[in-house]
């Protein structure tokens, strides 16, 4: 009986208070289910699993961009041929090169996706067996896509899901070996239905179908078939869906685009042509926006990528200019972990390093009001930078406000107050007329704030922004102090008491009944010997046999 009561309480506490699908890797960090990102070492390179703060930062950025059209969402990524899939990638402890091992490269590829890289440019060519392979390797494109499918399947939930970009750079030249003299002849293929029928391994549509799966791919026919309403706050005049509509409405996880111009849309109806993106390579003249008109113009350009060999400061700068950096630096198995530091400013463009800090319990003896559940925008004038930090919601600060008419116009409130007084929930807002309490939702918007504050000689300050984890700790949402967490059910103190009272009363009654039956036994059960004697005496009076 006591064990039943105990199990009942455990079941209630586990399933009645929290509704979450997170899974722990056993080391205190939350990782996508099914993806092995435990610390792995190979040739002096150790890849550390993500910290919980990093995962919260990436998730909060994704969520605040849910109303941004996908062509304006940053997709930081890498050139797979330069970073992983090249003949000099595998080295031993002495620095000597070893034969290429694609299983090791695939392991790091999974780790890079888990860290937060979202776009991958792949140089492909036709191999000797008329199959698509990564250029200058024997790695099949289909094997690479299977790795992407495994990641998509393992992260196909609201906690870890995100959209990936596959960018194909196609070399249409095929190298044919003569059987007689082993001479290599070059021939340029014309991709037609007849060629695909003769060599099905060259049919990109079929490869994507058999690896990723049609249900996960957002195709040109999806784009042309139905238009999602432009719920975004940017000035884009196109009809690309918002990130939220693509992920949660259509449940799509991959866009495939071609950088070159080898495929006709009719032969590959799963791939967007290069007319849908801006892809620059190397030391090109890149202009960053500096005024409102330039910011608006930048926001009207779809899918801007810049592939180059970067430094960390350049990754941060070009991210702020509205580009998705495509890192083409050469790495090997000994220094591949340095890619994390290079990707970091693009993967987490908002929060400071180590932020958001995890919410901890507040000592009960304190007399001050403390709630470390609100985000603040920390502007530094001298080094032209800004990062987000977790602050006490009851602290008095000014707030960041966005113009209701011009999305790249910003200001700050004149008065300082707690976070709870800034969102206008009580009918009053501290922001000026035609301005609203807001938050920068892309690196481009964050850069517009920096330039505007710099031009107005705005002093170093920390401003409230529309982001908090008030409803559920460590679940960061925008929409004011009463915004709810989509991943957990929040239970207030009042509701918790209301839920616990009937359970406690019922449990107390059951406990009293158990005590009663254990202390005051039934008389017949307690006097078993006397009862057995009465039965035996009665049996003696009965007549044996059949009466005559």
Swiss-Prot record:
Presence of the UniProt keyword Transmembrane helix in the record: yes
Leader sequence residues: 1-18
Entries under InterPro entries matching the protein: Telomere_Capping_Maintenance (IPR051008)
BP GO annotations: cellular response to hydrostatic pressure
GO CC term, one of those recorded: endoplasmic reticulum membrane
Pfam families documented for this protein: TIM-barrel_MTC6 (PF25506)
Membrane topology: Single-pass type I membrane protein
Cytoplasmic side: 517-548
Family in the record: Belongs to the MTC6 family.
Protein name: Maintenance of telomere capping protein 6
Name of the gene: MTC6
């Amino acid at each position: 009986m006591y064990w039943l009561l105990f199990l009942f309480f455990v079941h209630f506490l586990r399933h009645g208070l929290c509704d979450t699908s997170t899974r722990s890797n056993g080391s205190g960090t939350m990782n996508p289910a099914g993806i092995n990102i435990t610390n792995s070492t190979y040739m002096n390179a150790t890849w550390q699993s993500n910290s919980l703060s990093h995962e919260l930062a990436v998730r909060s950025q994704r969520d605040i961009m849910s109303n941004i059209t996908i062509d304006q969402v940053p997709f930081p990524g890498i050139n797979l041929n330069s970073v992983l899939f090249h003949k000099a990638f595998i080295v031993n402890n002495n620095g000597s090169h070893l034969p290429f091992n694609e299983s090791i490269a695939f392991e790091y590829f999974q780790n890079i996706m888990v860290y937060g890289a979202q776009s991958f440019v792949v140089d492909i060519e036709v191999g000797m067996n008329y199959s698509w392979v990564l250029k200058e390797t024997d790695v099949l494109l289909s094997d690479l896509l299977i790795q992407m499918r495994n990641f998509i399947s393992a992260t196909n939930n609201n906690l870890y899901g995100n959209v990936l970009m596959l960018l194909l750079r196609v070399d249409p030249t095929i190298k044919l070996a003569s059987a007689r003299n082993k001479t290599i002849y070059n021939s340029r293929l014309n991709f037609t239905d007849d060629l695909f029928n003769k060599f099905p391994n060259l049919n990109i549509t079929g490869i994507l179908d058999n690896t990723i799966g049609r249900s996960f791919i957002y195709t040109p026919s999806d784009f042309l078939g139905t238009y999602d309403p432009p719920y975004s706050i940017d000035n884009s005049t196109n009809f690309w869906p918002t990130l939220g509509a693509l992920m949660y409405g259509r449940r799509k996880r991959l866009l495939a685009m071609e950088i070159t111009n080898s495929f006709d849309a009719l032969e590959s109806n799963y791939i967007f042509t290069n007319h849908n993106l801006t892809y620059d390579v190397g030391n090109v003249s890149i202009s960053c926006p500096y005024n409102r008109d330039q910011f608006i113009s930048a926001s009207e350009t779809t899918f801007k990528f810049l592939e180059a060999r970067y430094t960390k400061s350049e990754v941060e700068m070009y991210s702020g200019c509205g580009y998705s950096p495509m890192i083409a630096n050469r790495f090997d198995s000994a220094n591949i972990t340095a890619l994390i530091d290079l990707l970091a400013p693009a993967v987490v463009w908002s929060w400071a390093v180590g932020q958001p800090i995890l919410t901890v319990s507040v000592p009960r003896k304190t007399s001050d009001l403390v709630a470390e559940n609100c985000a603040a925008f920390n502007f530094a004038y001298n080094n032209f930078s800004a990062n987000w930090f977790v602050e006490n919601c009851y602290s008095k600060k000014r707030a960041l406000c966005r113009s209701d008419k011009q999305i790249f116009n910003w200001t700050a409130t004149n008065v300082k107050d707690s976070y709870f007084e800034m969102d206008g929930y009580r009918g009053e807002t501290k922001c000026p007329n035609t301005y609203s309490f807001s938050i920068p939702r892309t690196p481009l918007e964050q850069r517009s704030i920096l330039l505007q504050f710099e031009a107005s000689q705005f002093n170093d300050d920390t401003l409230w922004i529309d982001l908090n984890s008030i409803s559920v700790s460590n679940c960061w949402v925008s929409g004011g102090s009463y915004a709810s967490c989509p991943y957990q059910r929040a239970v207030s103190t009042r509701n918790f008491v209301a839920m616990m009272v009937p359970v406690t009363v019922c449990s107390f009654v059951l406990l009293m009944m158990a005590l009663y039956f254990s202390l005051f036994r039934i008389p017949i059960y307690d006097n078993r010997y006397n009862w057995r004697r009465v039965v035996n005496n009665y049996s003696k009076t009965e007549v044996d046999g059949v009466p005559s």
